[in-house]
Amino acid sequence: MDKKLYDNYVKILENELVPALGCTEPIAIAYAAAKAREILGEFPDHVEMRCSGNIIKNVKGVTVPNSDGQRGIDVAAILGIVGGDASRELEVLESVKQEDIEKTRELAAAGYCTCTLQEDVANLYIVAKVCKGSHYAEVTIINRHTYITKIVKDDAILFEAAVSEESSNYVDKSLLNVKDILEFANTVDIDDVIAVLKRQIDMNSAIADEGLIHPYGAQIGRTLLQVYGDDVKIRAKARAAAGSDARMGGCSLPVVINSGSGNQGMTVSLPVIEFAKSLFCTEEQLYRALVVSNLVAIHQKKYIGSLSAYCGAVSAACGSGAAITYLYGGTYEDISATIVNTIGNVGGIVCDGAKSSCAAKIASAVDAAILGHFLGRKHHWFQPGEGIVQKDVEGTIKSMGYIGRVGMKDTDKQILNIMIDQVKVD
């Protein structure tokens, strides 16, 4: 493989597979607010948040980590101001103390934070403005959960960056394709990727254990094992769902994310880990399979976009299915069939925000990926011209990406309208 392409793929994994404490949208709000408070240099009198619809959608129903069960944009922002450490970025709330939680509860009840919907902006858009007397500081985040594009203090612009990927961390995701991903997985020097992949295995396995031991959320993972038994096909989706049960329920354990999402990070990894155990795979085989799952998921998301009405569990599960087929020695054709079969089955599940039902959607998506895997190994796959299925895997990925990015735009708006009570459904 060309060295430039090889280095780009390594960099993609390093950039994308990072730890995050709690659901990434409320964490991004906490980070923006904590950073604004740091710039202000004193404790503010109040905070004003302006957020895109997708941010509001993904924060409204999820428990803010380390908040003792509190929910909402105001809670995330206030907790970031009161007890957050902006230098920790996606782990901004890791060092929160009990007194910070109680103060957050009091300030939220007193209306300390206001939030307004910002329309006609990027899907991932957050502005945190903190005020003290006549002084203020404002931090803007666009496109990535920790990508600050502007810092203002008292009308003076202290920092401004292009609304694009950080230049120092730039990677070209347009170079991703299934064929090259498989070549990279087969040939990569494990030492170049072991750090990020081992961290993903360790952290995501720990939160899956937590979700199976304790009754978080709707207990999807626990219910799957109780009702359907202990077969690897059940364990694979149960552990991914259990991790989401815990994360959506406010568990403070960190997760290694994929495409900016903890749920997607767990979905691309935990089913693959479970199948690798059942097949008695070596650590190296597991690492190479995780390269496949992570990059296949990221490949799809570059067409779908970071936040949309398209449930990211589906693209993540496609990655898992591809990696499971890879573990079984599947060819490029078998792996392509797995991806197409998964997209053709559950592509288009809607995202109506981060919440407890995400775990159920993960279970459904992983189930479809496992079915897609078994069909693919038998050389069965949905044919070109059937729905959005194209002549090859790349065309099918692009067509589903178009549906998610363009076709579901109005769906996204109407989901938000329902969630914030802007429409009456008769």
Regions found by a protein language model. Give the residues of each.
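Acidic-glycine-rich active-site phosphate/pyrophosphate-binding loop
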Residues: 1-10, 43-55, 231-250, 282-300, ...
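Glycine/charged-rich beta-loop-alpha catalytic/anionic-binding loops adjacent to active sites
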Residues: 9-19, 55-63, 247-257, 297-307, ...
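Conserved phosphate/anionic-ligand binding catalytic regions in large, soluble enzymes, centered on
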Residues: 19-35, 253-270, 311-315
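Early transmembrane hairpin of solute transport permeases
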Residues: 27-126, 130
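Hydrophobic alpha-helical bundle architecture
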Residues: 36-39, 65, 275-288, 298-364, ...
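Flexible, glycine/charged-enriched surface loops at secondary-structure junctions
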Residues: 43-47, 88-93, 115-116, 191-197, ...
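Signature of multi-pass transmembrane helix bundles
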Residues: 108-250, 415-426
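Internal helix-turn-beta structural module
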Residues: 338-426
